[in-house]
UniProtKB/Swiss-Prot annotation:
PANTHER family: 39S RIBOSOMAL PROTEIN L18, MITOCHONDRIAL, LARGE RIBOSOMAL SUBUNIT PROTEIN UL18M. It comes from Bdellovibrio bacteriovorus (strain ATCC 15356 / DSM 50701 / NCIMB 9529 / HD100). This is Large ribosomal subunit protein uL18. GO terms for biological process: translation. Keywords: Ribonucleoprotein, Ribosomal protein, RNA-binding, rRNA-binding. GO terms for cellular component: cytosolic large ribosomal subunit.
Length: 121
């Protein structure tokens, strides 16, 4: 797959997107074991549980509107909330997709929160 970027795209973003494509070649979500995808912006963290076979999102959770905590603590709460919503839909096993980000900080905290909430990776 050939990627096209504008000349203003930062090298850091280009490298993350290349990593994302490499990871997505191996990480696929199914109906029995969907994919837990993480996205982090400058202020917020988003988590989705996706069935790639049907192409639909089963659960979506974010830190928008939850301003009482920030950073790592908020990411952990988002992970626990995603796990709670997933177990309500009888989802216990997921594949973790870090989306090209390093497994560190908010991404790791979200994964730990999801594990504490009852999801198995």
């Amino acid at each position: 797959m050939k990627l096209k970027f504008s000349k203003h795209t930062s090298e850091r973003k280009v490298n993350r997107l290349k990593k994302k494509i490499r990871i997505r070649k191996t990480v696929k979500g199914t109906a029995e074991r969907p994919r837990l995808c993480v996205f982090r912006s400058g202020k917020h963290v988003y988590a989705q549980i996706i069935n790639d076979v049907d192409g639909n999102t089963l659960v979506a959770v974010s830190s928008l509107g939850k301003e009482d905590k920030s950073g790592i603590d908020m990411a952990k709460l988002v992970g626990m909330e995603a796990a709670k919503a997933a177990t309500a839909k009888n989802i216990k096993d997921v594949v973790f997709d870090r989306n090209g980000y390093l497994y560190h900080g908010r991404v790791k905290s979200l994964a730990d929160g999801a594990r504490e909430g009852g999801l198995n990776f």
